[in-house]
Amino acid sequence: MYSNSKSRKNHLFIVLVLSSLLLSSALIINNSHHSDTNVVYGQKNTTQQHINPPTNTNPNLINLQDIPLEKVRVGDIDIAYKMFGKGDPIILFNGASDGLDAWDPALLMVISSNHTVIAFDQRGIGNSTVGSQPYTHQQLANDTSGLLDAINISKANVVGLSLGSYLAQQFTIMYPDKVNSLTLVGSSCGGKDHTPKPAEFIKLQSDIVNKSLNNVPLSTDELRELIAASLGSGWVNLHPESVDVPANITSLQQLKPGLPPEVADSQNKVGKYWEDNPLWSGTCDELGKLDKPTLVITGTDDIKYQPYINSFKIVEKVPGAWLIQIKNAGHAVMDQYPEGVGIILNTFLSTIK
């Protein structure tokens, strides 16, 4: 997922109901889903409130650069992580291509106010080594379990974004005793229930990865299209400058210097297996049996990266799951509305006994 720091810092507003949405969430029901599902929408233009964007001069913002990087040996790899805050643990599963430093400081400020937050580099990303084991959902879940064991965390609230949400689901299924709750952002339960991305966007992603593997320069149009797909049409219409690409940026490596092309290819294959395997039943049925408090967040404009209908399918299959859909947000919803997402997450977690 592409994180456009300029757009999220200079142009930040959230829907008013996000700050108080759970005061009445039990009363807001969408009858197309389970009757015991809490469904909250923040879509009415009349409820919008402009909020001053966070800046790095705010002493409460969490700058991960200021937090010491630690490493532990887990199996065949060294895992890099940072841990901060105080309270019940939250472990963050990054989106594809992102390292631990990609999380927005405003989001981290909110959630670390009453939780211990664990951000880490997945296998082969950033400061974590790639190892020799096959790059699979199962192996990445095993890595995470080993990390929690190494830092003496017995149970955590699991939060996953995009590809990280797939890994969060896999981890929850394989290690349910280590999971207190599950939050999925821009997600799908995969397999037979998955609604695919548009074919032209699948081709764009594959072309970009293949060009990166072969050191072929990317065009400005390709990069702009990739960014626009992540942000969604509503955000781009409001902030057209958010898709501007400097002329000297011609490769994925320049955007993601901590991402080796081979790992990008492995992550792409992991994602494709999850999304493009109709013979696999997916995870929805298994998640529904685990009885874990579940929060699902999606943007109204997440159409290309992860069609938002996939979030609806998770909620339909997981009894009691909460659905939050944020207006004018795309797949990059955690970058576009970091404080709002943090408030949602904190409030959801406060309801868990």
Stretches found by the model and what they are:
Residues 290, 296-298:
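Short beta-strand/loop motif that positions the catalytic acidic residue
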Residues 182-219:
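Flexible "cap/lid" loop of the alpha/beta hydrolase fold
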Residues 319-353:
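Catalytic active-site module of serine/aspartate enzymes centered on a nucleophile-bearing elbow/loop
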